[in-house]
Amino acid sequence: MVHFTAEEKAAITSLWGQVNVEETGGEALGRLLVVYPWTQRFFDTFGNLSSASAIMGNPRVKAHGKKVLTSFGDAVKNLDNLKGTFAKLSELHCDKLHVDPENFRLLGNVLVIVLANHFGKEFTPQVQAAWQKMVTGVANALAYKYH
């Protein structure tokens, strides 16, 4: 179980309140697919993923990115129970989709990069540390069913 201090919770929730879920989610998933192209195999129904511009402009990537980032919103609301919050998604990704759990860590790291890019100086080292802790906790919660 991940323990967040009051300061970490405040840093996470304060920034989350400013996140454009649709824009940031689409960018994070798009970057994941560009930077780690082997992750594209899980999205074979998404159409054209042949280039970075095709991926970043793909409406299905954007829509699924929004869905993924919305689930991070559930994490923000349930920082003290990440494992429980992601139990069903862990089961889905393990049993049905067979996603390599390492991809959860990669997506979390990409999300931190996207947030840093969007928020600039506001994304201080302390804010980054809190978010990195959260995305690691989410990745571990999503990987739980695999163990």
Curated annotation (Swiss-Prot):
Coiled coil residues, start to end: none
GO terms of biological process kind: hydrogen peroxide catabolic process
Origin species: Elephas maximus (Indian elephant)
Protein name, as recorded: Hemoglobin subunit gamma
Domain Globin residues, every copy: 3-147
Subunit structure: Heterotetramer of two alpha chains and two gamma chains in fetal hemoglobin (Hb F).
Record family assignment: Belongs to the globin family.
UniProtKB keywords: Heme, Iron, Metal-binding, Oxygen transport, Transport
Gene Ontology CC annotations of this record: blood microparticle; haptoglobin-hemoglobin complex; hemoglobin complex
Distribution of this protein across tissues and organs: Red blood cells.
Role of this protein: Gamma chains make up the fetal hemoglobin F, in combination with alpha chains.
GO molecular function annotations of the record: haptoglobin binding; heme binding; metal ion binding; organic acid binding; oxygen binding; oxygen carrier activity; peroxidase activity
Residues bound to heme b: H64, H93
